[in-house]
Amino acid sequence: FAPGMVSQKCLLCMCKLESGGCKPIGCRMDVGSLSCGYFQIKQPYWIDCGKPGKDWKSCSNDINCSSKCVQQYMKRYATHYRCPLNCEGFAREHNGGPNGCHSSRTLKYWELLQKIPGCKGVK
């Protein structure tokens, strides 16, 4: 995984939750638009993270590029919206988009992440 403010362990847990075991699963329809790859990244998220790699879909299916996108997205939004700078804050921001860390609708995502073996209480 790419280095950054999100811990490697937190990235692994997010990756496992998003792609059923941290796999390059391609694109799937999710709430009316495509989500792709290891972290199920949508095109607007990829644009917001600075458009790393060749293009959105290939970046999403490359573990280094997609984790770099997540790190850059958090650098941009988690600090701006004063999210807790821990795995819960990052995971909820990833799930809910800008300011998602403060939304009650992202609590279920965090609860699901903690049920993954080895992810309970991850920082």
Feature locations, PLM:
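Extracytoplasmic/periplasmic copper-protein system
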Residues: 119-123
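Alpha-helical segment that forms one wall of the substrate-binding/catalytic cleft
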Residues: 43-103, 110-118
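N-terminal prepro-regions of secreted/extracellular proteins
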Residues: 1-3
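Residues that flank catalytic or metal-binding motifs in active/ligand-binding sites
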Residues: 10, 34-37, 90, 109
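N-terminal, post-signal-peptide region of Sec/Tat-exported proteins
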Residues: 26-54
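Short acidic-hydrophobic sequence patches enriched in Asp/Glu that either
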Residues: 6, 33, 105
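Short, functionally critical alpha-helical segments immediately adjacent to catalytic or ligand/cofactor-binding
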Residues: 5-23, 28, 41, 70, ...
